[in-house]
Amino acid sequence: MNLAARALIRAIDVINRKGKSAGVRLVRLTGKRPYAIHPKHLVDHPWHDWYVPHLQANDFVLDVGCANGAHLVRAATRCRAIVGFDYDLAQLPIAARTIREQALGNARVFAWDITGAFPFPDRCFSAALFLDVIEHLHPRVAVLREIARVLRDDGRLLVSGPNRATRWRRRLEAAGLFSYSDPDHKIEYTREEFLAELAAGGFEPVGEVEPVVLDTPWAGAIDAVGGLSLGLYDRLSRWKRDAALRRPQDSTGFRVVARKRR
């Protein structure tokens, strides 16, 4: 790769990374929400809440690493009860406030280090959400085993993680640049690596591994657009989703419904 190509990729990467954080801030600055949140949480896309159809009305659900509660409050409308915990003390108050505002009597959150032992007895949950969290952790297998411990034998794990092998990630790597999609990520995966990590933690997939949206170098610009116009963001997000269905190898990540290994 010549110097000009490397410089172009670097410039696009800078725009991509800054655009995501700009979109989050613009949501608050433009009054779409009184707090900073990613615009993807403000549009109604069925693939965003992909886990909801896998929940049942009588489920007791655990949300591991619930952060601002965006997924938790959505799941609460589907299940009997849900508990979320996280050690992000900046995000948890947002989750608690949303629970109060929406009068979700079946949901609660609390602060806890999710990398340690969970404060729950064995086999007490029928489903667990572990969404875009595993890549931020170091003791990943230990956390998966804790999830397996607190899940019933017939319980379901709804888990997602990032794809490191997309065409854009490979271009960044070839240019000698940091290729992970988030600077806080401790790991990203190929499809096979992700399934191997789940297996090491005691889980096996039920059905196919599902894509998310296209990993495009212009994702950050699209996120920034979302901070300004949710209508345009909606259309661009649908394009990314359709592209990922056509090219699952270039999806931003993987989504898996898993069960405890037998």
Name each region found by the language model:
Residues 1-121, 127-131, 144, 209-213, ...:
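Conserved N-terminal segment of class I S-adenosyl-L-methionine
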Residues 90, 138-142, 169:
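Short N-terminal helix/helix-N-cap motif within the alpha/beta-hydrolase-1
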Residues 132-136:
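A short His-aromatic
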Residues 141-153:
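A short glycine-rich, Lys/Arg-flanked "PGG" loop and its adjoining helix->strand segment in the class I
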Residues 155-161:
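Conserved beta-strand signature within the Rossmann-like core of class I S-adenosyl-L-methionine
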Residues 163-185:
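Short, glycine-/aromatic-enriched active-site segment of Class I SAM-dependent methyltransferases
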Residues 186-201:
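Short alpha-helix
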Residues 239-247:
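Short, P/G- and charge-enriched loop/turn segments at secondary-structure junctions
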